[in-house]
């Protein structure tokens, strides 16, 4: 094995004039610490001075011999218990350095004078400890010394191998690992940049970054030249009983720290900042390893006539790739199959089912029963209505034509012009009063326009005025719509969408605030306008009409700016709509986004208008085109890093300039706001665009494997860029006095969450890649996942929900739901691994005896139990947070119900009893005790900020109670956090948590609302398919439903909704036959209209899902 070493600098007094380079070949017998401090050393292993100064782990001699304290079981050779210290403290004090000048002076002899000159040229950036100054010089290393070091390394390697040889350790008992592990030797070195002494010597030391410490570039190349690595540095050893007590070990005994050596280049020793974060550091195994993010799972889902592809960051891809999550899903399927053998899911379905006659009849039926409507909707959204035989539909349509006639004399077979006029008539009935309409338009251009600046306000208001009449704030209905040409339908479509989105922006996540606004007696114009708009809701039916407007244009052959704007706004609505949403996989809007991009290409928005001044000479239209194009570019990149979908826009295929400020090109009446948007949106985003684009090119490559080293190097720059531009989420959430508009306060938060969600996905893929290859690297990326998801973002869940002064709820909520979905998915995967490790230890033959006799074994088991408690509480916090949105967001409701059921499943003993045969693949890697404690501490600190101290479901915790083995029968499901730092969290950290509460919003009233919405959507879809043969009447448009009533968009607590809210025929949840539903549909869906979407929700056993 080739062991690489990196030279370390030996500090020297700044006033000394002695030569820097060692002149003697004789090995010093004094340890490096004593030599630095210039004190007498007793030459022990470790020496007394190092023990007193708590540096026993760094007691190293020049011959490469490391203190046995790093391998002993007692802490020191003197029997003293050494206080604990973090593993990277010493490495942080001794940064890795290379001298860039020494190899270039080959022609000059290594005289003391020349050596002194060389050493003076080296900059001194040494990180000093509390006993040293910051002006210590570094040691230059020449080629001759490198050869000498290589010779020494061979001796070091032989010593380490001898110490780690099980046969040489009389107290070692052979263990059978639960999965393949690394040999108990030095782990493979971590690489950043290749380095060879024969090549040109470039400075590999990076300068310190802002708010970051030095970025270490540890060099290592395999197959090129002998590599260089620092002497090993072990983790601190937890005081425990000596191994000489010969405890009885089972196959699940924890890894012993005294049998595992660690390296300075291992991830545990990398320390980049004072707070313990490792920013800009992403280690890898070697320069030759490659990865493909599509390996290990099937990204294409096929069921019957339907086929869907998902990117590597979609929830379904992570679910299928992770062995723990896939085993959970298989377990759920087995439970369903016991009750219904035909039950299958679309995500993990294996058999191709034929289209049954039962399903065909169900889709074509017109039953008003709630259960039938629900089943019918799920079949329709999976595309069953596309395969219903025409002969069945012909009979239905003929019956309807004979039964009903239109007052205008229109039938299904009349010309398209008549159908367009019929649509206009229906829209006329749906439009709100004049005052509501113009107030909502004003709200859009003052509040929402910066988030979607795709209209010219002057042109739009002029077009709307021609259609509905002059601007009048009167509380009266619009008399008529003057539609002169088909293109006016595109303008009407845009109008309907912005009315709906402006209405949705009125609502706050705090129900108390919404109630106060609805019942306010404040006479101020702002408060009264808010109350008036809330009392005049904008229904979902307007979006259906807007989509119908778009369908009358031949967008596959030709298009225009109003049509493009209508399609683009429709795509954005599907992202922000509470009843819709991207659903965590991006499939809902990907097809529509692709169409919008192709429309923009066909219109030439990818070309710079200044290059065609003969035809493109309207400043405002040119400015609008630039904004639309670059927002499409931003959205394309966002879809790629959020869901893993391929990019649609190539950098080589457009030359459109970034929008710029020019006199006369403003698209708003408020010119200052338009200029503010122009100068703030694009520079802030494109500053990190290059790094994201480079990462995506490597990660999303399907045809080739990418080098892990290249991905990690770009990730380093990307992380540093995020830290420099955004800081932390706490920094983004601090209101800035100079940023008046909510857009400026909101966009940094949204961008930060989006980019961190992307990084968590990448870290999880790297964790899975290294899980069975290298424990050190898998731990490193697991730690980064928890540091980002639990340590950085989770404490702010409720602040993101309630801090409307900084964030716009409608804009932030979809992204917040997505990252909670992803974080909880990873939490569940980790809980399965930790609990399976606990389960195997607990069920081993000598578990009780080991707990009583071996303190280390007991400590390891105890830390696993506490870590399980922390992860479970993190998952419960996520479910509780997203449940607060379940009253208004359908996607949030599905996450609440689904994840709550999954969490109950994995915290029961039944799951582990039945899945124990697959335990080797879903067990936590054998991390050290200190590593598990570190992960637990990250979670505990975050939970402490939220005040989450107890586990709601404690079945598993009660069964694996570790305290009974020490005679302490008092047990609590909360983690023991007496030693947790930051115990007294700031009051404002829990302010928003207290406003919402950590309880789970789980109410049958809410379930009925969303289930009824699915039934209503089914009915609306049926009516749309028959609208050509059915006349539109005002009585039909005025029918009430839970989502078209006065409370639409705002759903107060269930107690205030009982009674008339559900109409005359309440939706009976208890009447739904979920078992039959699962068997009939084979592949049911979430109730959304897009056929490219599916989710885990309806694949769960419904009879258990809705049981509290």
From Swiss-Prot:
Induction: Expression is coordinately up-regulated with MDR1 in drug-resistant, clinical isolates. Expression is induced by HAP43. SMART domains: Fungal_trans, GAL4. Residues 1-19, 68-83, 124-138 have a biased composition (Polar residues). Residues 134-165 form a coiled coil. Disruption phenotype: Decreases MDR1 expression and leads to greater fluconazole and cerulenin susceptibility. This is Multidrug resistance regulator 1. The gene is MRR1. GO terms for cellular component: nucleus. InterPro entries: OAF3 (IPR050675), Transcription_factor_dom_fun (IPR007219), Zn2-C6_fun-type_DNA-bd_sf (IPR036864), Zn2Cys6_DnaBD (IPR001138).
């Amino acid at each position: 094995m080739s062991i690489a070493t990196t030279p370390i600098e030996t500090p020297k007094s700044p006033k000394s004039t002695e030569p820097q380079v060692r002149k003697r070949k004789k090995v010093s017998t004094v340890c490096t610490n004593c030599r630095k401090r210039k004190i007498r050393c007793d030459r022990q292993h470790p020496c007394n001075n190092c023990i007193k100064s708590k540096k026993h782990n760094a007691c190293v001699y020049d011959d490469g011999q490391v203190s046995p304290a790093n391998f002993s079981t007692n802490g020191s050779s003197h029997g003293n218990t050494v206080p604990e210290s973090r593993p990277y403290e010493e490495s942080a004090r001794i940064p890795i350095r290379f001298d860039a000048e020494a190899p270039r002076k080959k022609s000059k002899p290594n005289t003391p004078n020349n050596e002194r000159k060389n050493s003076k040229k080296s900059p001194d950036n040494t990180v000093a400890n509390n006993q040293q100054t910051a002006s210590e010089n570094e040691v230059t290393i020449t080629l001759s010394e490198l050869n000498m070091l290589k010779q020494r390394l061979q001796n070091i390697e032989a010593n380490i191998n001898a110490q780690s040889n099980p046969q040489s350790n009389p107290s070692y008992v052979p263990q059978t690992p639960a999965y393949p592990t690394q040999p108990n030797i030095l782990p493979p070195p971590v690489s950043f940049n290749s380095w060879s002494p024969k090549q040109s010597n470039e400075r590999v030391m990076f300068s310190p970054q802002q708010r970051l410490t030095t970025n270490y570039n540890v060099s290592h190349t395999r197959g090129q030249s002998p590599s260089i690595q620092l002497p090993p540095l072990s983790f601190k050893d937890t005081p425990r009983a000596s191994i000489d007590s010969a405890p009885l070990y089972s196959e699940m005994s924890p890894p012993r720290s005294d049998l595992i050596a660690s390296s300075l280049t291992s991830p545990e020793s990398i320390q980049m900042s004072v707070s313990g974060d490792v920013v800009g550091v992403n280690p890898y195994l070697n320069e030759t390893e490659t990865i493909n993010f599509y390996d290990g799972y099937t990204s294409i889902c096929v069921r019957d006539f339907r086929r869907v592809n998902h990117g590597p960051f979609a929830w379904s891809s992570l679910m299928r790739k992770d062995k723990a999550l896939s085993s959970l899903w298989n377990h759920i399927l087995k439970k369903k199959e016991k009750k219904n053998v035909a039950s299958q899911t679309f995500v993990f379905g294996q058999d191709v089912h034929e289209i049954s006659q039962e399903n065909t009849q169900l889709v074509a039926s017109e039953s008003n029963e709630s259960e039938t409507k629900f089943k019918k909707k799920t079949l329709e959204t999976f595309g069953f209505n596309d395969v219903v035989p025409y002969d069945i539909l012909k009979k239905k349509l003929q019956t309807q034509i004979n039964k009903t006639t239109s007052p205008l004399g229109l039938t299904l077979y009349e010309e398209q012009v008549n159908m367009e006029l019929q649509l206009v008539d229906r829209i006329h009935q749906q439009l709100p009063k004049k005052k509501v309409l113009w107030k909502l338009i004003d709200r859009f251009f003052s509040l929402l326009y910066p988030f979607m600046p795709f209209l010219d306000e002057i042109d739009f208001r002029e077009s709307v005025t021609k259609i509905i009449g002059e601007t009048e704030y009167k509380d009266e209905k619009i008399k008529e719509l003057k539609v002169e040409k088909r293109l006016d339908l595109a303008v009407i479509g845009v109008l309907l969408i912005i009315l709906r989105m402006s209405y949705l922006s009125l609502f706050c996540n705090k129900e108390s605030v919404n109630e106060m606004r609805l019942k306010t007696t404040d006479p101020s114009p702002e408060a009264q306008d808010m109350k008036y708009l809330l009392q005049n809701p904008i229904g979902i039916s307007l979006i259906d009409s807007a989509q119908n407007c778009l369908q009358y244009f031949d967008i596959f052959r030709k298009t225009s700016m109003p049509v493009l704007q209508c399609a683009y706004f429709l795509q954005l609505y599907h992202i922000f709509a509470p009843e819709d949403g991207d659903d965590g996989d991006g499939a809902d809007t990907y097809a529509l986004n692709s169409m919008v991009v192709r429309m923009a290409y066909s219109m030439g928005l990818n070309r710079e208008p200044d290059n065609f001044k003969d035809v493109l000479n309207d400043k405002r239209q040119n400015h609008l085109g630039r904004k639309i194009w670059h927002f499409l570019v931003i959205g394309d990149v966002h879809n790629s890093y959020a869901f893993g979908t391929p990019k649609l826009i190539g950098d080589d295929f457009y030359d459109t300039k970034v929008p710029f400020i020019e006199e006369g090109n403003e698209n708003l009446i408020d010119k200052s706001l338009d200029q503010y948007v122009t100068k703030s949106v694009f520079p802030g985003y494109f500053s990190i665009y290059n790094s994201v684009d480079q990462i995506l090119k490597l990660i999303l490559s399907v045809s080739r494997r990418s080098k892990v080293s290249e991905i990690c190097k770009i990730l380093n720059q990307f992380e540093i860029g995020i830290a420099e531009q955004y800081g932390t989420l706490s920094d983004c959430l601090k209101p800035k006095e100079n940023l008046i508009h909510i857009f400026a306060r909101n966009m940094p938060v949204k961008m930060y969450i989006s980019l961190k969600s992307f990084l968590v996905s990448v870290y999880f893929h790297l964790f899975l890649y290294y899980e069975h290859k290298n424990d050190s690297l898998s731990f490193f990326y697991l730690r980064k996942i928890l540091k980002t998801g639990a340590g950085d973002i989770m404490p702010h869940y409720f602040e993101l929900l309630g801090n409307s002064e900084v964030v716009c709820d409608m804009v932030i909520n979809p992204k917040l739901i997505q990252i909670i979905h992803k974080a909880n998915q990873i939490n569940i995967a980790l809980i399965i691994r930790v609990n399976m490790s606990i389960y195997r230890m607990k069920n081993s033959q000598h578990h009780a005896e080991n707990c009583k006799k071996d303190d280390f074994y007991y400590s390891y088991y105890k830390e696993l139990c506490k870590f399980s408690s922390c992860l479970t509480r993190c998952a419960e916090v996520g479910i509780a947070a997203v449940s607060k949105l379940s009253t208004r967001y359908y996607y949030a409701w599905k996450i609440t119900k689904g994840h709550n059921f999954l969490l109950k499943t994995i915290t029961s003993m039944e799951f582990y009893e039945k899945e124990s045969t697959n335990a080797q693949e879903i067990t936590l890697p054998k991390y050290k005790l200190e590593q598990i404690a570190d992960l637990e501490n990250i979670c505990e600190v975050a939970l402490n900020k939220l005040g989450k101290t107890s586990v709601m479901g404690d079945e598993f915790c009660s069964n694996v109670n570790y305290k009974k083995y020490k005679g302490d029968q008092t047990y609590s499901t909360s983690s023991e956090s007496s030693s947790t730092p930051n115990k007294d969290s700031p009051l404002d950290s829990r302010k928003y948590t207290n406003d919402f509460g950590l309880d789970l919003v789980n109410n049958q009233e809410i379930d009925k609302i969303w289930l009824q919405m699915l039934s209503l959507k089914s009915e609306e879809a049926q009516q749309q398919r028959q609208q050509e043969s059915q006349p539109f009447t005002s009585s039909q448009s005025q029918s009430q439903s839970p989502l078209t009533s006065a409370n639409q968009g705002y759903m107060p607590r269930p107690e205030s909704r009982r009674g008339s809210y559900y109409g005359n025929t309440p939706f009976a949840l208890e009447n739904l036959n979920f078992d039959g539903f699962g068997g009939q549909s084979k592949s049911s869906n979430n109730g959304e209209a897009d056929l490219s979407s599916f989710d885990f929700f309806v694949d769960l056993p419904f009879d258990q899902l809705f049981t509290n």
